[in-house]
Amino acid sequence: MAAIELHKPEINADDDDDESPVEQVRLTVSNHDDPSLPVWTFRMWFLGLLSCILLSFLNTFFGYRTQPLMITMISVQVVTLPLGKLMARVLPETKYKIGSWEFSFNPGPFNVKEHVLISMFANAGAGFGSGTAYAVGIVDIIMAFYKRKISFLASWILVITTQILGYGWAGIMRKLVVDPAQMWWPTSVLQVSLFRALHEKDNARMSRGKFFVIAFVCSFAWYIFPAYLFLTLSSISWVCWAFPKSITAQQLGSGMSGLGIGAFALDWSVIASYLGSPLVTPFFAIVNVLVGYVLVMYMVIPISYWGMNVYEANKFPIFSSDLFDKQGQLYNISTIVNNKFELDMENYQQQGRVYLSTFFAISYGIGFAAIVSTLTHVALFNGKGIWQQVRASTKAKMDIHTRLMKKYKDIPGWWFYSLLAISLVLSLVLCIFMKDEIQMPWWGLLLASFMALTFTVPVSIITATTNQTPGLNIITEYLMGVLLPGRPIANVCFKTYGYISMSQAISFLNDFKLGHYMKIPPRSMFLVQFIGTVIAGTVNISVAWYLLTSVENICQKELLPPNSPWTCPSDRVFFDASVIWGLVGPKRIFGRLGNYPALNWFFLGGLIGPVLVWLLQKAFPTKTWISQINLPVLLGATAAMPPATSVNFNCWIIVGVIFNYFVFKYCKKWWQRYNYVLSAALDAGLAFMGVLLYFSLTMNGISINHWWGAKGENCPLASCPTAPGVLVDGCPVF
């Protein structure tokens, strides 16, 4: 198999003024603009608001399920194209005048600028790629895991302010990382490519629209089987079936609770969960994920569990995100939380230290290494280029796209500063007057805001030039865990206001660059993003509130009926993180008072690793494969595990290799024409079938769980411990 290299973008500051200095931009983005195209249309508002509300609802709704589904902006990009054209055909062209203002429901053909703004609405509804507002997870763990109360008002303020705060940081940094041509934002270039493909004249026998409809119908019809009639299709773990009484065999073969050897799925929600659609991931990235996954799952974990019994691994399941006590039983979190939402030291000392499954512990160590290696890797391999690009971005010379954007009124700075001030004031109100509900003191908010402002500049520059976004969340968790131990909600709130608001800022900036390339009036972008964010956040928390108050025992896997979909795997990991970093604190987990201080050495490993790769590249410059070693990706490959499982990775890698290597190499024209359309159709089909099944069958209690194929993957022993004397329901005692 031939190696596929990712080349650094060629930047030439001496190019002609009518060309971008970045080669990828020159090849993809049009140098022309038509300012007469209407953007503030009824079609844009109707389809944009509808898309925002639908995606907010669906992503929040499916986020609580065992196999969460995230519907992205790409689905809306494809679906709204025929809808926009249909509205252009059927809406009346009558013009209405109100004073000097003229309005029409149908000002002309549906155009690409309307389409871009609709997609920005949808991107807000999709949580800018995360599915739902991150702060919703805080409400989830308060109500479902800690069994405490929080008001809807406090929840709404928390969700909205953490989103809008990021918008304020984005406004401050916009001139530095959006306008300069050297800040080229690779993912925005990808979106431009898709928009241009969708709006090109299509006279082929199998148009993209027709292909989408066919794939959508097939996806819609098929999903009833893995979602309702034949649940085993979500994880076909045949090794468990061959060895129904062997714990070791089921640990090896389970796709949900084990190493997943031979496990696969015929369910798109399993394939696209956690890692996103493999159809839109570059092959180079897939190979890095594959190598990292194999190293961790099939080398490190077996040696740690069976070979060395690291951290008393045999007392616990081989793959679990749960927290345990020394006897291998589930840790009773509720007993160590007092009525002030703080750590009850007396009960904690009685119950003892917190233990993690070996996989969960090692995944934290790998996460430490991945964070540091990201910064080291970028400094060594991209530092010189980034510095040159930052220096170039301060020059007065503008590229063709920035000059074309000068035709439109810019966004006044006070718009951003006003939003920033309002969100900070509301956040302070939350911290001062509703402190009992969120625990975070006012100084915590100010410190988190300072960290966000500090990190937004370097991280956004790294993302804009290298397409790598360092994950700095553990830094905020670690810091607050040390400053204010024993307060779990304060810890997650600090992380959300600090790291997540910075992450939101980067998402906003990415959308701004897309609008920059597509020549969208800046004020239109601002209003669409702001309105979409407020609507999406409101829908997110409303749907979450409904599910949390209406689904009995939601997120409580041990109390739910067998095969219930409401297990909230992502919230379980989020809850465990709040316990580790907030309630118990880093000192009692990873410090001298805990079981895992040795994991701190992974920080050093992450620091040294990229240096070794860099030295190897310098020593052997002709060995091109060395330059393709990307330790942040290799180490971060398993960052989604848990809650992602081995069957998710198995299927994602297989499908990704098929489409982004074989199909891309041997059927490139098909890939260019239909690959993204197929991904969007698969997402949309199962999403609509999932909602239909819930409202027509699940809500009415209609199930068919009496037969073998409706009982999941049938690996009941995969989660059993193998240490002598450990008692777990349903497991043999050694």
Curated annotation (Swiss-Prot):
BP term (GO), one: protein transport
Membrane topology qualifier: Multi-pass membrane protein
Induction field: Highly induced by iron deficiency.
Residue intervals passing through the bilayer: 44-64, 68-88, 125-145, 152-172, 211-231, 252-272, 283-303, 359-379, 414-434, 442-462, 525-545, 596-616, 644-664, 677-697
A single GO molecular function term of this UniProt record: oligopeptide transmembrane transporter activity
Superkingdom, taxonomy of origin: Eukaryota
Keyword entries, A-Z: Membrane, Peptide transport, Protein transport, Transmembrane, Transmembrane helix, Transport
GO cellular component, one term: membrane
Main location: membrane
Compartments (UniProt record): Membrane
Tissue: Expressed in flowers, leaves, roots, and stems.
Role noted for this protein: Involved in the translocation of tetra- and pentapeptides across the cellular membrane in an energy-dependent manner.
Similarity annotation: Belongs to the oligopeptide OPT transporter (TC 2.A.67.1) family.
Protein name: Oligopeptide transporter 2
Organism: Arabidopsis thaliana (Mouse-ear cress)
Gene this chain is encoded by: OPT2
